[in-house]
């Protein structure tokens, strides 16, 4: 598969939605739908996709997740200083997000008909670790956490995590062909 455009400058629309990629835009080779939402206090958004798994990652703010018969109120100052909260659900499961303060979330979806148990990933489930320490004069060193991948959630067709580079270091990732090969082969 040939990759098309790999970088752009998306912006939020007047409803607080920023589209990063869809199945049919210029980044369609990613085979995912990824969007970021800015929410005001009291705002409610619902996410439910048939034939797709969905992950809702808190980037910053204070909000309440509601899914199936469960509720969890979570908060995160920002992606740089506090751990991540993420709900991951299979096809057809509704996730309701209520912003208790100004909140920003990332919603990532991909096609997947497999049914699996919904899971709320807490900060302690995906601790930060360092990658590429000492490589390339140590300019590739970065903090990474894997929220889920094929090893953590074998039923998933997605990988979700965060990467933080130290100032002045390269942005990007060294290719891990094993993980990405597994994802592409599904």
Model-derived features: positions:
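Basic/polar N-terminal segments that are highly enriched at the extreme N-terminus
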Residues: 1-3
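Glycine- and acidic-residue-biased ligand/ion/polar-headgroup-sensing regions
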Residues: 50-70, 167-169, 173-174, 178, ...
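A short glycine-rich, His/Asp/Glu-containing loop-to-beta-strand
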Residues: 12-46, 134-178
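Ligand-binding loop in jelly-roll beta-barrel domains
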Residues: 73, 78-118
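Fe(II)/2-oxoglutarate oxygenase catalytic core
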Residues: 26-31, 46, 54, 80-81, ...
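Short amphipathic beta-strand/extended segments with alternating polar/hydrophobic composition
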Residues: 48-49, 69-77, 119-123
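Double-stranded beta-helix
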Residues: 103-143
């Amino acid at each position: 598969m040939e990759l098309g455009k790999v970088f752009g400058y998306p912006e939020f629309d007047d409803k607080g939605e920023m589209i990063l990629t869809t199945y049919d835009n210029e980044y369609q080779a990613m085979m995912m739908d990824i969007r970021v939402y800015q929410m005001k206090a009291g705002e409610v958004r619902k996410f439910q996709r048939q034939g797709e798994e969905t992950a809702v990652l808190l980037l910053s703010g204070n909000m309440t997740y509601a899914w199936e018969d469960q509720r969890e109120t979570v908060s995160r100052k920002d992606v740089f200083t506090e751990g991540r909260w993420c709900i991951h659900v299979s096809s057809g499961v509704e996730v309701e997000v209520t912003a208790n303060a100004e909140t920003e979330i990332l919603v990532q979806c991909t096609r997947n008909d497999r049914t699996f148990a919904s899971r709320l990933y807490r900060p302690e489930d995906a601790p930060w670790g360092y990658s590429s320490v000492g490589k390339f004069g140590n300019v590739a060193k970065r903090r990474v956490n894997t929220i889920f991948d094929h090893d953590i959630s074998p039923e998933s067709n997605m990988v979700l995590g965060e990467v933080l580079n130290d100032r002045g270091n390269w942005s990007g990732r060294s290719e891990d062909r094993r993980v990405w090969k597994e994802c592409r082969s599904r």
